[in-house]
Amino acid sequence: QWLSFLGEAYEGAKDMWRAYSDMREANFKGADKYFHARGNYDAAQRGPGGVWAAEVISNGREALQGITDPLFKGMTRDQVREDTKADQFANEWGRSGKDPNHFRPPGLPDKY
């Protein structure tokens, strides 16, 4: 059972990385919430280990962005807080098994 959990976590982490890589490649305005939801959704489909990996990675990413966004994007604390809230909503949406296409922006290439 523990080995299964670790395998799910590993595969879930790969799902999260794939969504992040696709987001960077697409470079499509307004698509970040879709990729957040999709990565979490795909990881969660792996099982409890995937859910765990998605949550740890999502929370870590948001904590890091709380530091880097004000420095590199010039965002205020309020802007960071709102963006984090929206990102976490999309993360939880996907992790709970809801369709990530809810956040898909019009015009995003079908490849994603």
Curated annotation (Swiss-Prot):
Q: Which GO terms describe its cellular component?
A: high-density lipoprotein particle
| UniProt modified residues of type Pyrrolidone carboxylic acid | Q1
Compositionally biased tracts (Basic and acidic residues) = 75-86
Q: Where in the cell?
A: Secreted
* Keyword Transmembrane helix among record annotations: no
Q: Name one GO biological process term.
A: acute-phase response
Sequence segments annotated as region (Disordered): 75-112
**Tell me, what's a Pfam family for it?**
SAA
Q: What induces it?
A: Upon cytokine stimulation.
* Signal peptide location: none
PROSITE patterns annotated for this entry?
Answer: SAA
Q: In which tissues is it expressed?
A: Expressed by the liver; secreted in plasma.
What InterPro entries is this protein classified in?
Serum_amyloid_A (IPR000096), Synovial_Prolif_Regulator (IPR052464)
Q: Which UniProt keywords apply?
A: Acute phase, Amyloid, HDL, Pyrrolidone carboxylic acid, Secreted
Q: What is its main location?
A: secreted
- What does the protein in this record do? Major acute phase reactant. Apolipoprotein of the HDL complex.
Describe the disease involvement stated in the record for this chain.
Reactive, secondary amyloidosis is characterized by the extracellular accumulation in various tissues of the SAA protein. These deposits are highly insoluble and resistant to proteolysis; they disrupt tissue structure and compromise function.
The text of the family note is: Belongs to the SAA family.
PANTHER family associated with the record: SERUM AMYLOID A, SERUM AMYLOID A-3 PROTEIN
Q: What is this protein called?
A: Serum amyloid A protein
Q: Which organism is it from?
A: Ovis aries (Sheep)
What lineage, starting at the top, does this entry show?
Eukaryota, Metazoa, Chordata, Craniata, Vertebrata
